[in-house]
């Protein structure tokens, strides 16, 4: 014991017990993946899920997105009960679909319907990346095509918010067919004088970026959104060149003429309202059957 008085004891960092770590319930705090700042989740939600420190746009689910742009209580959903099957009998596909349905409380990776922005009627589709990474299968393509056709019938603008990893591999060619189907529906809408606004959010890639996401009369994007067809590494290996650091970001695409504007989430509803207001009357009122 006397020896202990003259020996410097090593100091160790105290590791909190499992019970102490559980004192902070899940979901109370949110860590920004960009600036690493830890904030109260309620502050992030209050700011439309935009980091108050660096402006990083956290992903929004479909319902959060609809609430942020439409007049309160105006949304009426289309085709809610449509669900994907497994036509190619892809192993474990049904289980993955069911898991995502329980996790997201959605039947598929897109929510479609109609609502108003400042009392102006629009048909809207919002992709939700929580469901199979927002991938486009036969039901996603069908719901979007039907929504476009509804906009055509109602003679109102169509708005889509994209967030997708591309075509859904478990549905093979049936998934790839949706690229053509949605594009044809949009062409019909456009030929009749219909307005189409595409808003690309993080990420918008693969077959979605190569089809309806890029066909808007106005192509908008959120800051920092990843937008592209093939992945960065695949392109670098193919062209044998190092790509710019900001390659495939919304800002890069805007600089190179592929977007009309990069719009902060705080300004999105007002930007859409202004576009809709500009297109009221005039040639927009002339529809061809």
UniProtKB/Swiss-Prot annotation:
Reactions the enzyme catalyzes: N(6)-carboxybiotinyl-L-lysyl-[protein] + acetyl-CoA = N(6)-biotinyl-L-lysyl-[protein] + malonyl-CoA
One GO CC term on file: acetyl-CoA carboxylase complex
A Gene Ontology molecular function term of the record: carboxyl- or carbamoyltransferase activity
Cofactor note: Binds 1 zinc ion per subunit.
Cofactor(s), by name: Zn(2+)
Pathway: Lipid metabolism; malonyl-CoA biosynthesis; malonyl-CoA from acetyl-CoA: step 1/1
Keywords: ATP-binding, Cytoplasm, Fatty acid biosynthesis, Fatty acid metabolism, Lipid biosynthesis, Lipid metabolism, Metal-binding, Nucleotide-binding, Transferase, Zinc, Zinc-finger
Listed EC numbers: 2.1.3.15
Enzyme superclass (EC): transferase
Domain CoA carboxyltransferase N-terminal: 28-289
Pfam family, one: Carboxyl_trans
Protein name in UniProt: Acetyl-coenzyme A carboxylase carboxyl transferase subunit beta
Organism the protein comes from: Bacillus anthracis
Gene name for this UniProt entry: accD
């Amino acid at each position: 014991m006397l020896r202990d008085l003259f020996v410097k004891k090593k100091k160790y960092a105290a590791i909190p017990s499992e019970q102490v770590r559980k004192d902070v319930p899940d979901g109370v705090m949110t860590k920004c993946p960009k600036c690493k700042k830890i904030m109260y989740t309620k502050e992030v939600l209050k700011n439309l899920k935009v980091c108050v420190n660096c402006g990083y746009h956290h992903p929004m689910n479909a319902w959060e997105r609809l609430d942020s742009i439409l007049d309160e209580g105006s949304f009426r959903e289309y085709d809610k009960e449509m669900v994907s099957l497994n036509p190619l009998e892809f192993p474990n596909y049904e289980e993955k679909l069911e898991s995502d349905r329980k996790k997201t409380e959605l039947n598929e990776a897109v929510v479609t319907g109609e609502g108003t922005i400042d009392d102006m009627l629009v048909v809207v589709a919002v992709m939700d990346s929580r469901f199979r990474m927002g991938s486009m299968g036969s039901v996603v393509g069908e719901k979007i095509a039907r929504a476009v056709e509804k906009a055509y019938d109602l003679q109102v603008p169509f708005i889509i918010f994209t967030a997708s990893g591309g075509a859904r591999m478990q549905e093979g060619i049936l998934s790839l067919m949706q690229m053509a189907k949605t594009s044809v529906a949009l062409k019909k809408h456009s030929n009749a004088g219909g307005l189409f606004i595409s808003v690309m959010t993080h990420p918008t890639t693969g077959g979605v970026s190569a089809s309806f996401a890029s066909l808007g009369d106005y192509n908008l994007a959120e800051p920092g959104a990843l937008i592209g067809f093939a992945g960065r590494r695949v392109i670098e290996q193919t062209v044998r060149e190092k790509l710019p650091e900001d390659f495939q970001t919304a800002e890069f695409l805007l600089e190179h003429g592929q977007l009309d504007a990069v719009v902060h989430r705080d300004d999105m509803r007002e930007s859409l309202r202004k576009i809709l207001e500009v297109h009221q009357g005039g040639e927009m009122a002339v529809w061809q059957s």
